[in-house]
Regions:
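Short glycine-rich or small-residue beta-strand-to-loop segments that form or flank ligand, phosphate
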Residues: 1-7, 23-26, 52-61, 68-71, ...
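Mixed-charge interfacial surface used for oligomerization/domain docking
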Residues: 120-224
Length: 283
C-alpha cells in the first residue's frame, strides 16, 4: 500500500491521487504545514496490508521527521513500513524548509509509477526500488511571476515587482534562488532546461515531461511553455514519450509553473502507461 501527503494548498496533490493504480491514502496537514505523526500513523493503519506500506515523502524537514515518526509507531504495531524521499528540485540545495533538495512536482511521477508497481502485488522492497528509480531519474525546476499568500501569514511569502519573476521557486511560497526581470516564456524555459539537463544526462533517452501550473497560470500559457520544451528537447535529440500539462502540484494562487523531466527505460514506460483511475490523474 502507498501513502503520501504534506501540507494543504497543493491541490490536487495529494488527495487527488488516491485511487486505483496510485496512492491508497493521502494525509493533509494545515496549509503548507506537515501533517502530524498521529495523523500519518492513522493513515498507515487504515491501509496496511500483509505486504506493508511505502511512505512517499517530499524532502522537507517537517515532512520527513513526521512521516518517520509515524513509520516507527506503525512498526511497533508490527506493520512493515518502508520509505522513499523525493528531492527532484534542481534549483536549491538547502532552504528554509529543507536539508538538501526539495521535493516538488516530480513526486506525482513517483505516485504514478510506484502505484502501478504496487498494483502488481509485488513485495514492498520491489515497490520501494521502483519508487527510488523514479526519484533518481526525475528533475524539476520552477519560476513564479506572482507570489501566494498563506492565510495564517496574511501576506505574500515574497515580494515581486510588476516586471519581476522569482527563479527556482518552491511549492510553499518560499523564495527561489534569485529575482530577475520578467522574460519571454521561451527564454525562461531555456534557463530551466539548461539547469535540468546539466544535472542529469538525458541524451539518447526517452523522457516524460510534466508542465505544472503553480495554481493561477492558465492552460493556454502552459501549452505555450510546453511547445518550447518540446522544441528544445527535439533539438537536443531527446525524444518525448509522454507529456502531462496542467495542475498537478500547486501553491495556492501562485502564478508560475514548473517543468519536470523523467528519464525513462522500458520498465518505467510500462508502469507510466499502466491503468490509473483517480480524481486528478487517469491513465
Amino acid at each position: 500500500a502507498l501513502i503520501s501527503g504534506g501540507g494543504s494548498g497543493h491541490e490536487p496533490a495529494h488527495g487527488g491521487y488516491v485511487g486505483t493504480g496510485m496512492l491508497d491514502a493521502a494525509v493533509a496537514g494545515a496549509v503548507f504545514t506537515s501533517p502530524t505523526p498521529d495523523q500519518i500513523y492513522e493513515g498507515i493503519k487504515a491501509i496496511a496490508t500483509d505486504k506493508g506500506v511505502l511512505m512517499v515523502i517530499k524532502n522537507y524537514t517537517g515532512d520527513v521527521m513526521n512521516f518517520e515518526m509515524a513509520g516507527e509507531m506503525a512498526q511497533m504495531d508490527e506493520i512493515k513500513v518502508a520509505q522513499v524521499v523525493v528531492n527532484d528540485d534542481v534549483a536549491v540545495d538547502g532552504s528554509l524548509y529543507t536539508v538538501g533538495r526539495r521535493g516538488v512536482a516530480g513526486t506525482v511521477f513517483v505516485h504514478k509509477i510506484a502505484g502501478a508497481k504496487a498494483e502488481e502485488g509485488v513485495e514492498l522492497e520491489e515497490v520501494q526500488r521502483v519508487a527510488q528509480k523514479v526519484i533518481d531519474n526525475v528533475r524539476t525546476m520552477g519560476v513564479a511571476i506572482r507570489p501566494c499568500t498563506v492565510p495564517a501569514a496574511g501576506k505574500p511569502g515574497f515580494e515581486l515587482g510588476e516586471d519581476e519573476m522569482e527563479v527556482g521557486i518552491g511549492i510553499h511560497g518560499e523564495p527561489g534562488t534569485h529575482k530577475e526581470p520578467l522574460r519571454p516564456a521561451d527564454e525562461i524555459v531555456d534557463h530551466i532546461l539548461d539547469k535540468i539537463l546539466a544535472d542529469i544526462d538525458y541524451t539518447g533517452h526517452e523522457v516524460a515531461v510534466m508542465v505544472n501550473s503553480s495554481g493561477a497560470t492558465p492552460l493556454m500559457e502552459l501549452f505555450i511553455i510546453n511547445n518550447h520544451v518540446a522544441d528544445v528537447l527535439a533539438a537536443k535529440g531527446i525524444k518525448v514519450y509522454k507529456t502531462f500539462v496542467g495542475e498537478y502540484m500547486t501553491s495556492l494562487e501562485m502564478e508560475g509553473f514548473s517543468v519536470s523531466l523523467l528519464r525513462l527505460d522500458d520498465e518505467l514506460k510500462a508502469l507510466l502507461d499502466a491503468h490509473a483511475d483517480t480524481i486528478a490523474f487517469k491513465a
